[in-house]
A protein has these predicted regions:
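Switch/connector loops and helix/strand junctions flanking conserved nucleotide-binding motifs
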Residues: 95, 124, 160-166, 212-215
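Conserved small helical "lid"/interfacial subdomain of P-loop NTPases
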Residues: 183-246
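Loop/turn-to-beta-strand initiation segments
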Residues: 147-154, 200-202
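A short, basic N-terminal segment
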Residues: 1-82, 433-439, 443-444, 448, ...
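C-terminal structured domain segments
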Residues: 397, 412-426, 445, 487-590
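Walker A/P-loop nucleotide-binding motif
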Residues: 78-98
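AAA+/P-loop NTPase substrate/partner-engagement loops
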Residues: 105-139
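Extended alpha-helical coiled-coil/bundle linker/stalk regions that scaffold oligomerization
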Residues: 224-490
Length: 608
């Protein structure tokens, strides 16, 4: 008999409802009804380990984590010893969806296993979640595991696993604790999780797998694109496309409906690639974790502009017909993507990537040209790959006569954002070149390709040496005593790169990888190395420092660990033997050195 617990907000992957949105006014003829299946707050958005519906089967997409878990389950089912498979991860990452999928696909094999969904609530009100885990895992305790032949799959969040092995029950499960620590399950390290036939413990950590992969120095996501394709694909199985084809063409609002327009735009391959790129940027730059549940809900928010349209209104279609030009422009997908941080944490991250914040000479020149033009729609036709009729609603506006500057401004925003997601031609660049170089370095670092990493290590070293201000080659400025107004104080330091910690991975496409790079340096004076974790924010800041930027107080508060790292390296420099002083703000800045003569035991201060 299966031992299953459920948690309302925990084990969710594919978000569905089995009945259409309740709106009698719509009848059975609106795309919104089917799109509502994607909404996170829908009636049946919660998924445990139970029924795997036809719609879930349609939306299911195979992932690498699924393939790894499948291998473990197949081998564990044939083992002669007890087997506990830890399916670890975070909220909404699809643990229960995949287990539910296996139950449906391999019922005979899954019958051999007891299944348990970790939950913050216990089986009984009087018991805590720790009490429950202690009870259900009894056969895997130190005293029972050798005599057990039980097969058990535990879907558990990393935080709960950590709390359990550190709880009062940890002593009973010291072997499980040892396994978790040796495999570094609770750390950010990427460890091998292949089946160990001599062990009763196996694991797959969903947190090791990202929504994207790295290949040839670029990020890709067949997973995100597959989810979009499930929504937009022109196949008979696709209920969304079937509804669009059946209802949208004949709808009275077909030429003025932003929902139809956004659905059509989402079918554009350029748009899909841009969405993938934006998601990768959100994950790397903002360090957010995007679950499949949140991803699918995002697709709903992307198509349905609920900030301007109430889909539950009995006047929905009339309201759409009455949308004025300003709100219609705001309802279009490029504006939705970047302009609604209130919708979710994903939209909040996207708001920080708004291409309206990109300023360069070509962008500024275009804005002037756009604002002075009496006919702006040709710009869209020439440079933005919108579907036919996407901005048809604006064709009758006489921009030479209208005094309403707001509509021109909204269309300017629509153009720049639209050019970002599906532009054509080469009118200006909105690319983040620093991010592109970070992804390239991240790929080569995770592969351990030393020949491609010299610039990364050199740039980081230069950033370290210039963090406290411009200095001579192989010198670093230090702060001693009072704040020096007249002199800059420096020391000699010889930093050497240490690549002993580089990962080793010969795969061309990386499916398991770290999203930060751990770089090591050592001084020639000491054999000991110090390491620093370089994420995108630090990577970008160091490049700015190399170009002359001086970190401010906010930067120093944000990168405390990096400052501690610099201080450790500084202690290995020449400060105990020689200091260099350079005058500031003079026509000719003189240089001096203070050094200690070991032979005669005295200090000497001389001009260089």
């Amino acid at each position: 008999m299966e031992n299953i617990t459920h948690e309302v907000n925990e084990n969710v992957d594919i978000v569905v409802i089995e009945s259409s949105i309740s709106n009698k006014n719509l009848g059975e003829n609106c795309l919104v009804q089917e799109l509502y299946r994607l909404k996170e707050s829908s009636k049946e958005a919660v998924e445990g380990l139970g029924e795997f519906t036809l719609f879930k089967k349609y939306m299911h997409i195979e992932r690498e984590s699924q393939r790894q878990l499948e291998k473990l389950i197949f081998k564990a089912s044939k083992s002669n010893i007890a087997q506990l498979i830890l399916v670890c991860g975070s909220v909404g990452d699809g643990k229960s969806h995949i287990i539910s999928y296996f139950k449906n696909m391999y019922p005979e094999i899954m019958k051999k296993f007891i299944l348990h969904n970790d939950a913050t609530e216990s089986l009984e009100p009087s018991k805590t979640s720790m009490d429950t885990l202690n009870e259900v895992l009894n056969n895997f305790s130190d005293e029972n595991i050798e005599n057990s032949n039980e097969k058990f799959i535990l879907a558990i969040n990393l935080g709960t696993l950590n709390n359990f092995i550190d709880s009062k029950y940890g002593e009973r499960f010291s072997k499980l604790r040892k396994f978790a620590l040796e495999k570094k399950i609770l750390e950010s390290n990427i460890e091998d999780n292949s089946f160990d036939e001599k062990s009763s413990f196996q694991f797959v950590n969903f947190s090791d797998y990202h929504l994207f992969t790295l290949e040839d120095g670029r990020a890709n996501s067949s997973y995100i694109k597959s989810i979009i394709t499930k929504i937009t694909d022109s196949s008979e199985e696709n209920i969304f496309y079937s509804s669009y084809k059946k209802n949208c063409y004949e709808c009275d609002n077909c030429n003025v409906c932003p929902i139809k327009a956004n659905y059509e735009l989402l079918r554009n391959e350029k748009v899909q690639e841009s969405i993938v790129d934006l998601f990768v940027q959100c994950i790397i730059k903002n360090k957010i974790i995007i679950s499949t549940r949140a991803l699918i809900n995002f697709m709903y928010e992307l198509i349905v502009p609920r900030s301007y349209i109430d889909v539950n209104s009995t006047r929905l279609k009339k309201d759409i017909r009455k949308l004025h030009n300003l709100d219609y422009a705001r309802c279009l997908m490029p504006n939705i993507i970047f302009n609604h941080k209130e919708l979710s944490f994903i939209f909040e991250a996207l708001n920080s990537l708004d291409p309206l914040n990109v300023r360069n000479q070509k962008v500024d020149d275009f804005i002037i040209k756009f604002n002075n033009s009496t006919d702006i729609l040709p710009y869209f036709k020439e440079y933005v790959d919108f579907p036919s009729g996407y901005i048809e609603k604006f064709k009758n506006i006489d921009f030479g006569k209208t005094e309403d500057t707001r509509i021109r401004y909204e269309l300017l925003k629509l153009f720049i954002r639209g050019y970002y997601v599906c532009g054509k031609g080469n009118i200006f660049s909105l690319k983040d070149r620093i991010f592109e170089s970070y992804i390239q370095n991240l790929y080569f670092w995770n592969r351990g390709d030393k020949s491609k990493l010299k610039n990364l290590y050199d740039n980081t070293k230069n950033g370290i040496l210039k963090w406290n201000g411009e200095s001579e080659k192989d010198q670093i400025n230090i702060f001693i005593g009072k704040n020096q107004i007249k002199y800059r104080v420096s020391e000699d330091i010889q930093l050497k790169v240490d690549t002993s910690n580089l990962p080793r991975n010969n795969d061309v496409e990386l499916k398991k990888f770290g999203t930060v790079m751990i770089l090591k340096y050592k001084s020639e004076k000491l054999n000991r190395s110090y390491e620093i974790e370089v994420d995108f924010s630090l990577y970008k800041l160091l490049l700015q420092v190399i170009d002359g930027y001086r970190p401010n107080k906010k930067d120093k508060n944000h990168f405390i660990k990096f400052i501690e790292f610099i201080n450790k390296l500084s202690e290995t420099g020449s400060q105990n033997e020689k200091l260099l002083f350079t005058e500031k703000n003079r026509d000719v800045n003189k240089k001096y050195k203070l050094e200690y003569d070991n032979e005669f035991e005295f200090y000497r201060f001389v001009e260089i």
